[in-house]
Amino acid sequence: MIQTNPADKVELPRIEKYSGNVYSQKQLEELFNIFKGNPAEFGVVTAAFYGLRRSEVVGLKWDAVDFEKKTITIKHTIQQTKVDGKLQIVPCDRTKTKSSCRTLPLVAPYEEILLKMRENQEENRKLCGSCYCTDYLDYIYVNEIGEIIKPDYLTTHFKAFLEEHNMPHIRFHDLRHSCATLLFAQGVPMKEIQAWLGHSTIGTTANIYTHLDENSKINSANAIIGILEQKRTLRAFHLRVSF
């Protein structure tokens, strides 16, 4: 009988984590411009500014917005899953983790977007009459006839639209990465970025969402050069003193 398991000595391959791409501030501004008036515009702006997950974007409800206190609470999601081989919409009154439930400030530009969304919904409901879908009246992100915007729609439409406009390829989820990276570049503390994104651990924030852009790398290189130049100057000074 073998006393030890030979497999215990086998070194398993390391799991490589996917490293997404990110957009710079300039690229995000260009992105917002090309999506103006597009059905996916609200999803793109929300994911990029608030760093929301796809399920959180489509799961936003009106009761999560407090126009008086100027806050928006991320507490609902919508999942899309297969049931008997068919994709089904599954609303959830909970987020991915406990820490994912978070309250964020409702800034003026985004408040204007929400007010316009609500106005459009009211107008569409009057125009459509009995044809208007009443299943998702509590939700913010619906189409002209009141149907919820499906998570898969955001993914596929986003990809196709980028290709159509010759924009660098990123996933819809990479808008969340871009949000975190821009916050990091602006000097926002990692703990605050963690709270903004709703991560359960700060390690997730640090390891996944702090993609350094080229400018950050150049700044780091210049800092090293500065240190080396300083040391060279000091060394020369010491040499002169020794004479």
Language-model segment annotations:
Residues 1-6, 67, 76-83, 116-130, ...:
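Proline-centered turn/helix-capping motifs that create local helix->coil transitions or kinks
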Residues 2-62, 67-68, 99-101, 135, ...:
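Basic, Lys/Arg- and aromatic-enriched nucleic-acid-binding interface segment
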Residues 4, 64-71, 169, 188-208, ...:
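Short, polar N-cap/turn motifs at the start of nucleic acid-interacting alpha helices
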Residues 21-22, 56-59, 149, 170, ...:
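Gram-positive cell-envelope targeting signals
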Residues 33-38, 50, 104, 120-130, ...:
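Short, basic (Lys/Arg/His-rich) helix/loop patches that form interaction surfaces
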Residues 69, 80-82, 88-101, 108-110, ...:
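C-terminal secondary-structure termini that scaffold catalytic or DNA-interacting sites
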